[in-house]
Amino acid sequence: VTVVRDTGERAILPPFTDEHTQLRETINRWVREEIVPHVDEWEAAREFPRELYNRAAELGFLGLKYPEELGGQGGDYVHDAVWAEELAAAGASGGVGSGLGAHTGIATPPVYRFGTPDQHERFLRPAIQGERIAALGITEPGAGSDVASIRTMGRKVDGGYVVNGSKTFITNGVRADFLVCAVKTTEGGGHQGISFLILEREMPGYEVVSKLEKMGWHSSDTAELSFTDVEVPEENLLGEENRGFYLIMENFAWERLLMALGAVGAMRRLLAVAIEYAGEREAFGRPIGRFQAIRHKIAEIGVKAEVGRSLTYHALRRWLAGEDVIADVTKAKLYTQRACVEVADECVQILGGYGYMREYGVERALRDARLGPIGGGTDEIMKEILGRQLGL
């Protein structure tokens, strides 16, 4: 499948350069040559090989936005935006994209932004090199969108903290070598009492309770974790004590932008699949793309993909400029996730019986897309944020 690129694409782009365009092509080629041929196998195995992190690191993809002195490529967040969109556009699958994306997009950025030089050396550098896998631990069995309700406790002791509690729905949780984990460090402190600690897999009391079975994202590992008297040294405190909630909120903006970019990439790919199939599949003596009903479906897919891209790139431009982007990011996340589900569903319909089979990958795209309106903040939470932004 050749991903659709229209002649008006550059007119609405954020500050992309020829270097970013070249990066798109490099990522797209890597995914098509080294990932797509194995996706079905990895989906069945319920994980992709750990060596994929090493290969991505070798190509520089795990450190695109990090400085060269830490082993990164010295790029910027636009490079990371290209990475998120093109993984999906080239067909990496939601599982592969989420596993690599959780490592580069949500788990390591807090370590870079708020970590000490020592933490950079112990955690960020080996993560960039693909030697240590990172995960972010916020969600708990009783606390999802309501972050302030987390109950995992980090009790202050001499020289550090003792952590007790649990986390769930943790992407990379089964294989993560370290977990950037939100804990309560002040009893009854609400959002004011949250801190971030870096928990390491080998710490006694750190347990992977189960590898969770999911509707989609089959090739990524998702875990429930348990912590029983886990002793965490003080040097693993990330940022200031009791200021973790603000770190979470800052990280959420970028996570939601990455989710929007991934959905934009997925819709680009689905549009290409639909166009290709409609041009080749014949019914009643002519390609089905000649029928108005099919043409209109594909036209709507194109509109949704373009609207999603415009909203997302607008939010990205403002985010890069350091502006207040809460409303823009929320709109982009809300629209693209729901639109991607609708686009994938229409693609299944256009392909008919073949859409229901695994050969074309659109049934997987539908299963993968369905997490979008839930993860990173549900649609309902996004609407609540927008309502408040409107003064309601």
Residue ranges of predicted features:
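Alpha-helical interface subdomain recognition
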Residues: V1-G94, F114-Q119, P126-E131, K156-Y161, ...
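Short glycine/proline-enriched turns and hinge-like loops at secondary-structure junctions
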Residues: G75-D76, D146-A148, N172-D177, G190-G193, ...
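N-terminal glycine-rich flavin-associated loop
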Residues: V96-D118, G144
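Short Gly/Pro-enriched turn/cap motifs at secondary-structure boundaries
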Residues: L100, A127, G142-S145, F169-N172, ...
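A short, Trp-centered hydrophobic/proline-enriched beta-strand micro-motif
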Residues: G130-I138
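Flexible, small-/acidic-enriched active-site or ligand-binding loops
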Residues: S149, E202-P233
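A short core secondary-structure module
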Residues: G160, N164-V208
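Long, acidic (Asp/Glu-rich), low-complexity accessory segments flanking structured domains
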Residues: D229-L247
